[in-house]
């Protein structure tokens, strides 16, 4: 694998950790806020698919309402075939809602900008619209 990068973000959303966890783990809610078909298993080792199959992966660690760790890969042209990155969401209740401590490690350097923009546009902005 060529060079990789890390995306680290903290996102405050004015809702409960449970609502954010469900948005990521419930196929119907995930499909609604990303405006594309998603199929999400709730089992460790279970498959994750979003954006009509353009993103796929597996659940590595799930602690309801607290933590989600998944492997992810993209079908995009800047993503090596068969290569997986890892996302981690830690959900912390705070006074004004929930702080998402997010990391996405092993992002291929050539895909970094589009992946980072995708998180901002398709996830954080859309989640805020849906849940706040």
Language model features: what each stretch is:
Residues 2, 106-132:
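A conserved amphipathic terminal alpha-helix motif
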Residues 2, 8-9, 15, 27-58, ...:
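Short beta-edge strand/loop motif at the mouth of beta-sheet-based domains
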Residues 7-9, 70, 87-89, 100-102:
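Hydrophobic residues positioned within well-ordered beta-strands of beta-sheet architectures
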Residues 14-18, 60-66, 90-99:
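A short, structured loop/turn motif at beta-sheet edges
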Residues 20-21, 30, 48, 59, ...:
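Hydrophobic pocket/interface hotspot
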Residues 32, 60-62, 79-83, 110-116:
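A short, polar/proline- and glycine-enriched secondary-structure boundary/capping micro-motif
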Residues 69-90:
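Mid-chain, well-packed structural core segment of small domains
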Residues 73-76, 103-110:
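Short, solvent-exposed aromatic-acidic interface loops
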């Amino acid at each position: 694998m060529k060079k990789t990068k890390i995306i680290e973000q903290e996102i405050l959303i004015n809702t409960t950790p449970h609502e954010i966890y469900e948005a990521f783990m419930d196929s119907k809610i995930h499909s609604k806020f990303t405006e594309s078909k998603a199929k999400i298993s709730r089992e460790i080792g279970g498959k994750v698919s979003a954006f009509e199959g353009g993103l796929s992966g597996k659940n590595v660690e799930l602690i309801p309402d607290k933590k989600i760790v998944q492997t992810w890969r993209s079908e995009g042209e800047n993503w090596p075939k068969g290569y997986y990155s890892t996302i981690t969401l830690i959900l912390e209740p705070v006074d004004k809602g929930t702080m998402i401590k997010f990391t996405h490690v092993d992002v291929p350097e050539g895909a970094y900008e589009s992946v980072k923009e995708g998180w901002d546009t398709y996830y954080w902005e859309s989640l805020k619209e849906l849940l706040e």
